[in-house]
Regions:
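Glycine-rich, low-complexity segments
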Residues: 1-27, 166
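Extended, low-complexity regulatory regions
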Residues: 40-42
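Terminal beta-strand-rich extracellular "head" domains
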Residues: 23-24, 29-34, 46-126, 130-166
Length: 166
């Protein structure tokens, strides 16, 4: 879904040029120490190479843990523009770790998270933003998107790209 704003309809220092939203209703699982696509993504074609693109994503995730442990493994989430990690320092936007529990406890949990980032893609070509995830110990933890670790889909995730003319 895209919303376009005709020139001159806003009298602000910055103008919203267009808004694109994508909703991911499927589910996916990830067991990798490298960042892998979650299926949550949005594409936008900026009208000006000087525009900024505000990316907002809200997503659900769970996990399956293969062993009981006092402390959980780390799960990492970041945004990519094409093949480029756009997190500060090319690292990640956030890491998540539950404090304690059994593998059964971890399998039952669902978390909701969000990332918001103002990007400067400097292009007028179609640009795809993707949410990717990884973990510090993929042999012990599998990240699930839009579901608990042991259940079917429990919801949907969205990503919005908003072109802002500055």
């Amino acid at each position: 879904m895209a919303i376009n704003f005709p020139e001159g309809t806003q009298d602000l220092p910055s103008k919203i040029v267009q808004v694109v939203q994508a909703t991911y209703t499927g589910s996916s699982t990830h067991a990798s120490s490298s960042f892998t696509d979650t299926g949550i993504q949005v594409s936008i074609t900026p009208k000006s190479s000087s525009s900024k693109v505000l990316i907002m994503t809200s997503f659900l995730f769970g996990q399956t843990k293969s062993v009981n442990a006092v402390q959980d493994n780390m799960k990492y989430f970041t945004l990519f523009r094409g093949s480029t990690n756009i997190a500060p320092g090319n690292t990640r936007f956030f890491a998540h770790q539950n404090e304690s529990g059994t593998s059964a406890n971890f399998d039952e949990q669902t978390q909701v998270a969000s990332i918001t980032y103002l990007d400067s893609p400097a292009t007028t070509s179609s640009t795809t933003y993707k949410l990717r995830c990884s973990s510090d110990n993929p042999s012990q933890v599998t990240i699930s998107i839009n579901r608990r670790g042991i259940a079917d889909n429990t919801g949907s995730s969205t990503m919005i790209a908003m072109e802002v003319e500055t």
